[in-house]
Amino acid sequence: LAQRGSDLLRKQGGFDMYDVAIIGAGVVGSAIARELSKYQVNACVIEREEDVCNGTSKANSAIIHGGFDATPGTLKAKLNVRGNFLMDELARDLDIPFKRNGSLVVCTKDQDRSGLEKLLEKGTSNGVPGLRIIEREELIAMEPNLSDDVTCALFAPTGGIVCPFHMTMAFAENACTNGVKFFLNTQVDTIEKNGDSYRISTLHTDTKNKETFEAKVVINAAGVYADVFNNMVSENKLHITARKGEYCLLDKDAGTHVSHTIFQLPSKMGKGVLVTPTVHGNLLVGPTAVDVDDKEAVNTTASGLDSLAATAARSVKNIPMRQVITSFAGLRAHEDSDDFVIGEVKDAKGFINAAGIESPGLSSAPAIAEMVTDIVKGLLPLEKNPDFVGTRKGILRPNTLSLEERNKLIKEHPEYGNIICRCEMITEGEIMDAIHRPLGARSLDGVKRRTRAGMGRCQAGFCSPRTMEILEREVPMSMFDITKNGVGSNIVVGYNKEV
């Protein structure tokens, strides 16, 4: 059900009429696909990258926000709180790494306490439970490494941390299992109204072949490019600005420096630089917030990374920045209205936007999926899918098992005793599972996002060749076709004796 080339697409009936075509396989598009798969609907997801979770969804703060920052009455406020509420059940059913570690918005000596009081008022209005302002004595007992300048903080116990890769993969895999077709390496070039449906012309980025889709309903979940697709079919133009955020990821030795997610008072550019543990035990610092013209500008900068350390120190002291193991940047899709843009386009019947999904987009994704599905119900006759499977198991992690369980597993499946990634203790069996499960990995980064092989201290310096050998054997595919992250990122280009 996951196709990566036009030849496979033809075999799967890519010229068929779909009830629903979703553009974008990030967390929002994948969540919508999963929600729609609860119904008897012929749906597909069209994604230009070689894998799901390859845009904003792979480069963000990995936070499930409480919902106290959004302006009451906005979609951000409503959908953040609902999405937060849904996370416990989703994490259980779809095996998503998720933890309610709570969040703190700190106020320093040179800041007005009224900022926290306004956030408390907003959060209460939005229906966020358990909010309270706590003073320094209690704060330091909770977080000993807070800056000496911190005087008080807003505590949100429902705030959490999640793995955005696994969250997106879980939605996508479950949707795929329930019959949604995913077309990867498929770039949308044009969308045109064609009677009662839409004609979507695409280019396969790997083969350069062109293909056409027809769909009664189109859902636009294309991140920073959502305005481009909206503006193809509507006179009600959107303008989305790419807002770049740079991050530093620290080694697991630094992962206990804080236990809660530490925010600073938000500004018009966002929630500011945070310091947070991750569900996998690292420490994350970021993001910056700089508007850029280039919707592909995911490069990091020396000035941006330098500013992170200085800004983060205002809330948390002694951050061991020498333990940074990697840095990265992501783009948030900021729409001029400063709110999510979700709904059927007035002058383009059957075209539904899920646009402008910046923070708290990850937190809101499950609720956005519900909202969009309700809109589709008003356009198409949807009946419940009697065969819907609502659960999914993630990749088995031998290092979470007891010694007795691990020995039994290795005796039955020896590949789980062969360590490939020493930093993260990832086995050959886990990588094989990542390749063979629905929407299986076909690149080094695809394996990395599913298993964490290559995410540790050496950043794939040791395990890359061994992971490539497993990809070559299990897909199977030529070593020359294996990429880091899709078209144009091939690892091996020739034999050394021939160069």
Model regions: which residues?
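N-terminal Rossmann-like FAD-binding beta1-loop-alpha1 element of flavoenzymes
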Residues: 18-44
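Iron-sulfur (Fe-S) cluster-binding segments and ferredoxin-like electron-carrier domains
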Residues: 296, 427-438, 461-479
